[in-house]
């Protein structure tokens, strides 16, 4: 079934998914905050700011008017940075069709409230509309999807009907969507992996090897799972695409913004220098702060997250943080 879809957020991932959906035959309008970006995409069929070199489907429409984006839509895909979800979706409420399925592809935890993205939606949306919420997450670099490289992700929703509808809307010959009912687990996997990816990048920047990276990924997965279980997620979710899959990709891939931030920190640059030069958002920086505070609030042990917080926000030297992780009290592996 062809959908009329509003895609909110024209970063690399939002633009890529809008293009994918348009190529599949859906009627798609991509909303961008910047009027000049809308004009460029209309004129050149390219998003040179966030997805350079990719020609966008001729059927894709562009706007910076929220009312126009939402008009008559049957599905909404929100792909704005997690710290902006509350503002953008609150502004969207007057225009949001009540029956529309809402797909969240934002990955993070709100700093001020420690709310996951679905919890933000729960606060904003009427109950009957919140039931139509799904989360889309998994190992998926935007550029690789834009180039139609085979990719698999997960769509999680509290109802089977919503999950199936999202699965059917997004699945193509190169983009395979699996269903899941664990919205909390899928969201947390997508959020926490960004913090671990910065840690893996720092390790690479310091010149440590594959052993160190493997340890960070594995113990990072344990921390992610502990936090998820404390919040009601299913442990098995973290062994899937939205957990281990996304974690491995983001900790090892050269297209990972979060890993790139970590590499530069490991090489001696300051966080403020790095962020000052970035056009796109590295979600893991803010998520480090929110995950650290959330773990403290829930009493969940997350030593990698704790050391990451001290490095990014308290100027702790990276080598000192690694030493502390390696000299903690000995324990059984477990989770």
Swiss-Prot record:
<keyword id="KW-0547">Nucleotide-binding</keyword>
<feature type="binding site">
    <location>
        <position position="281"/>
    </location>
    <ligand>
        <name>NADPH</name>
    </ligand>
</feature>
<keyword id="KW-0594">Phospholipid biosynthesis</keyword>
<dbReference type="GO" id="GO:0005829">
    <property type="term" value="C:cytosol"/>
</dbReference>
<dbReference type="GO" id="GO:0046168">
    <property type="term" value="P:glycerol-3-phosphate catabolic process"/>
</dbReference>
<keyword id="KW-0560">Oxidoreductase</keyword>
<feature type="binding site">
    <location>
        <position position="138"/>
    </location>
    <ligand>
        <name>sn-glycerol 3-phosphate</name>
    </ligand>
</feature>
<dbReference type="InterPro" id="IPR036291">
    <property type="entry name" value="NAD(P)-bd_dom_sf"/>
</dbReference>
<dbReference type="GO" id="GO:0005975">
    <property type="term" value="P:carbohydrate metabolic process"/>
</dbReference>
<dbReference type="Pfam" id="PF01210">
    <property type="entry name" value="NAD_Gly3P_dh_N"/>
</dbReference>
<dbReference type="InterPro" id="IPR011128">
    <property type="entry name" value="G3P_DH_NAD-dep_N"/>
</dbReference>
<keyword id="KW-0963">Cytoplasm</keyword>
<dbReference type="GO" id="GO:0051287">
    <property type="term" value="F:NAD binding"/>
</dbReference>
<keyword id="KW-0444">Lipid biosynthesis</keyword>
<dbReference type="InterPro" id="IPR006168">
    <property type="entry name" value="G3P_DH_NAD-dep"/>
</dbReference>
<dbReference type="Pfam" id="PF07479">
    <property type="entry name" value="NAD_Gly3P_dh_C"/>
</dbReference>
<feature type="active site" description="Proton acceptor">
    <location>
        <position position="193"/>
    </location>
</feature>
<dbReference type="GO" id="GO:0006650">
    <property type="term" value="P:glycerophospholipid metabolic process"/>
</dbReference>
<feature type="binding site">
    <location>
        <position position="107"/>
    </location>
    <ligand>
        <name>NADPH</name>
    </ligand>
</feature>
<dbReference type="GO" id="GO:0008654">
    <property type="term" value="P:phospholipid biosynthetic process"/>
</dbReference>
<feature type="binding site">
    <location>
        <position position="256"/>
    </location>
    <ligand>
        <name>sn-glycerol 3-phosphate</name>
    </ligand>
</feature>
<keyword id="KW-1208">Phospholipid metabolism</keyword>
<feature type="binding site">
    <location>
        <position position="258"/>
    </location>
    <ligand>
        <name>sn-glycerol 3-phosphate</name>
    </ligand>
</feature>
<comment type="function">
    <text>Catalyzes the reduction of the glycolytic intermediate dihydroxyacetone phosphate (DHAP) to sn-glycerol 3-phosphate (G3P), the key precursor for phospholipid synthesis.</text>
</comment>
<keyword id="KW-0520">NAD</keyword>
<comment type="pathway">
    <text>Membrane lipid metabolism; glycerophospholipid metabolism.</text>
</comment>
<feature type="binding site">
    <location>
        <position position="12"/>
    </location>
    <ligand>
        <name>NADPH</name>
    </ligand>
</feature>
<dbReference type="GO" id="GO:0047952">
    <property type="term" value="F:glycerol-3-phosphate dehydrogenase [NAD(P)+] activity"/>
</dbReference>
<keyword id="KW-0443">Lipid metabolism</keyword>
<feature type="binding site">
    <location>
        <position position="257"/>
    </location>
    <ligand>
        <name>NADPH</name>
    </ligand>
</feature>
<dbReference type="InterPro" id="IPR013328">
    <property type="entry name" value="6PGD_dom2"/>
</dbReference>
<feature type="binding site">
    <location>
        <position position="13"/>
    </location>
    <ligand>
        <name>NADPH</name>
    </ligand>
</feature>
<comment type="similarity">
    <text>Belongs to the NAD-dependent glycerol-3-phosphate dehydrogenase family.</text>
</comment>
<feature type="binding site">
    <location>
        <position position="283"/>
    </location>
    <ligand>
        <name>NADPH</name>
    </ligand>
</feature>
<keyword id="KW-0521">NADP</keyword>
<feature type="binding site">
    <location>
        <position position="140"/>
    </location>
    <ligand>
        <name>sn-glycerol 3-phosphate</name>
    </ligand>
</feature>
<dbReference type="InterPro" id="IPR008927">
    <property type="entry name" value="6-PGluconate_DH-like_C_sf"/>
</dbReference>
<feature type="binding site">
    <location>
        <position position="193"/>
    </location>
    <ligand>
        <name>sn-glycerol 3-phosphate</name>
    </ligand>
</feature>
<feature type="binding site">
    <location>
        <position position="142"/>
    </location>
    <ligand>
        <name>NADPH</name>
    </ligand>
</feature>
<feature type="binding site">
    <location>
        <position position="257"/>
    </location>
    <ligand>
        <name>sn-glycerol 3-phosphate</name>
    </ligand>
</feature>
<feature type="binding site">
    <location>
        <position position="107"/>
    </location>
    <ligand>
        <name>sn-glycerol 3-phosphate</name>
    </ligand>
</feature>
<protein>
    <recommendedName>
        <fullName>Glycerol-3-phosphate dehydrogenase [NAD(P)+]</fullName>
        <ecNumber>1.1.1.94</ecNumber>
    </recommendedName>
</protein>
């Amino acid at each position: 079934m062809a959908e009329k879809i509003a895609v909110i957020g024209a970063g690399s991932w939002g633009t890529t998914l809008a293009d994918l959906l348009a190529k599949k035959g859906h009627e798609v309008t991509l909303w961008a905050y910047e009027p000049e970006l809308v004009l460029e995409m209309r004129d050149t069929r390219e998003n040179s700011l966030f997805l350079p070199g990719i020609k966008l489907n001729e059927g894709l429409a562009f706007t910076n008017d929220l009312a126009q984006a939402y008009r008559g839509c049957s599905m909404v895909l929100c792909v704005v940075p997690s710290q902006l979800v509350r503002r953008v979706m609150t502004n969207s409420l007057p225009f949001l069709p009540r029956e529309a399925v809402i797909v969240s592809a934002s990955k993070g935890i709100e700093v001020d409230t420690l709310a996951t993205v679905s919890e933000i939606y729960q606060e904003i949306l009427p109950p009957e509309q919140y039931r139509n919420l799904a989360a889309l997450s998994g190992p998926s670099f935007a550029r690789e999807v834009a180039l139609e490289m085979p990719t698999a992700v997960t769509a999680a929703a509290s109802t089977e009907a919503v999950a199936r509808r999202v699965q059917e809307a997004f699945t193509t010959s190169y983009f395979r969507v699996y269903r899941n009912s664990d919205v909390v687990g899928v969201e947390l996997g997508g959020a926490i992996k960004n913090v671990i990816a910065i840690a893996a990048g720092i390790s690479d920047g310091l010149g440590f090897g594959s052993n160190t990276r493997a340890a960070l990924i594995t113990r990072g997965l344990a921390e992610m799972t502990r936090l998820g279980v404390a919040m009601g997620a299913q442990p098995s979710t973290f062994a899937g695409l939205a957990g281990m899959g996304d974690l491995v990709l983001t900790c090892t891939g050269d297209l990972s913004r979060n890993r790139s931030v970590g590499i530069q920190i490991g090489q001696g640059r300051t966080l403020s220098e790095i962020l000052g030069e970035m056009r796109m958002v590295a979600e893991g920086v803010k998520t480090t702060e929110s995950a650290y505070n959330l773990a403290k609030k829930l009493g969940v042990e997350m030593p990698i997250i704790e050391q990451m917080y001290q490095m990014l926000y308290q100027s702790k030297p990276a080598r000192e943080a690694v030493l502390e992780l390696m000299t903690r009290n000995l324990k059984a592996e477990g989770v």
